[in-house]
Amino acid sequence: NTVSSLNGGTAPDFILFQEIDTSSDRSWHVNQVSEAESRFGSYASYFAQNFHTAFLAYPLTEFHGTSNSGILTLSNVLASSATRRTYPIDESFPTKFFDLDRCFMITRYPTSDGHELVLINSHMSAYDKGGTSRAQQLALLTKIMSEERAKGNYVIAGGDWNHAILGSLTLYPSVQQVPDWVAELK
């Protein structure tokens, strides 16, 4: 209900969701993808699974339990294609078992000038001490965006960056401590 009321009566061309559940304990097994699709019924829908586990015993004080989630792109026009791409992640034990299988989705829309609008819905790693995986993920995304621009395509990337972007850490006064896993993009 909250998400569908956020548009304030406007009709956005694109809506990008991350951490949207299909059947997870954290959302009481409500299929949030189906809910979003029904609330934005005239929109085309593209879903990519990001995380699936029968039971995640983390954090130890309050288990995540069953998790089935992903990213969802809704658009008011049909895409010519939608492709899930995997980000590089930390494969070490136990990180591999507690971090999401990070991904991004590329949807392509033809334009009147013969090029494409390339829309990227991204969900990057968060808990990456030292920022190694996030640096690799950002490099991959930058490469793909640059390649698309070189073809003359228009590129929009949005999503959950799990980064502090260009001075945003000090943009709004706060007494909150910045966790050590936060990486600042410059």
Model-derived features: where do they sit?
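Acidic/histidine-rich helix-loop elements
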Residues: 1-3, 59-62, 91-99, 125-133
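Metal-dependent phosphoesterases centered on the DNase I-like endonuclease/exonuclease/phosphatase
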Residues: 129, 133-186
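Short, Asp-centered acidic motifs that coordinate Mg2+ and/or phosphate
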Residues: 14, 117, 154-156
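N-terminal, active-site-proximal structural segment of metallo-dependent hydrolase catalytic domains
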Residues: 1-68
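Active-site environment of divalent metal-dependent phosphoester hydrolases
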Residues: 22-25, 53-55, 92, 126-129, ...
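Active-site flanking residues adjacent to catalytic metal/cofactor-binding acidic residues
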Residues: 18, 122, 158-160
